[in-house]
Amino acid sequence: MIFPVAEKFISINGESIRAGEPAVFIRFRGCNLRCGYCDTKWANSPDCPAEMLSTEELSSYVIGTGITNVTLTGGEPLLQEGIYELIEKLMKNGCNVEIETNGSISAAELDAMPFRPAFTFDYKLPSSGMESAMLTENYKYLRECDAVKFVSGTEADLEKAAEIISRFALTEKCKVYISPVFGGIEPKRIVEFMLERKLNGVRLQLQLHKYIWDPEKRGV
């Protein structure tokens, strides 16, 4: 299988379940959503330049780095035909695979895999313009190794995040994060909201890579 890879690089995980740890990133081209605040819009376009790499080439690259944490992102990785084969190959070779998905595509097949990766579902809040695409039935597949994150840009976003966390009892199933749209709502306000609402088990998360490097820099 051949994959359109917008970029591949080694860095630290800037967010989610392995934040701060070294990781290999594979960013695939193409996404089925168009979020208003998306910080990787360039990778969503079918015109985005991409390396066309086979399963074998990608797995050889990842394994050759010597880094065991692997983040498959995009774009939307679950749009990629052959993604299950790639995940299985990586995990059979000792990699810890995390799938960053926008939450609009069923995770049933991934959940049933003998070599199951960790999921990070990105619930799209009202300011994204894409909330109607969210497939909340995916939450029945959540395990302790998984995460749901809420990227918030407004007070309405925070209110909706609290509602979804409560409705689906997410903190009882997996890690839960609220993070600010970079340059938008202040992290301090998110902390205040979490304390006001007694959001036990919910974590504030900042995109570490945007504080270490230029927020617009790619490949980090």
Regions found by a protein language model. Give the residues of each.
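Solvent-exposed, non-transmembrane amphipathic alpha-helical segments
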Residues: 25-29, 46, 162, 168
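Flexible, acidic/Gly-rich N-terminal and inter-domain linker regions that tether
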Residues: 1-29, 33-37, 41-42, 197-203, ...
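Amphipathic, alpha-helical segments enriched in basic
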Residues: 1-6, 10-13, 33, 37, ...
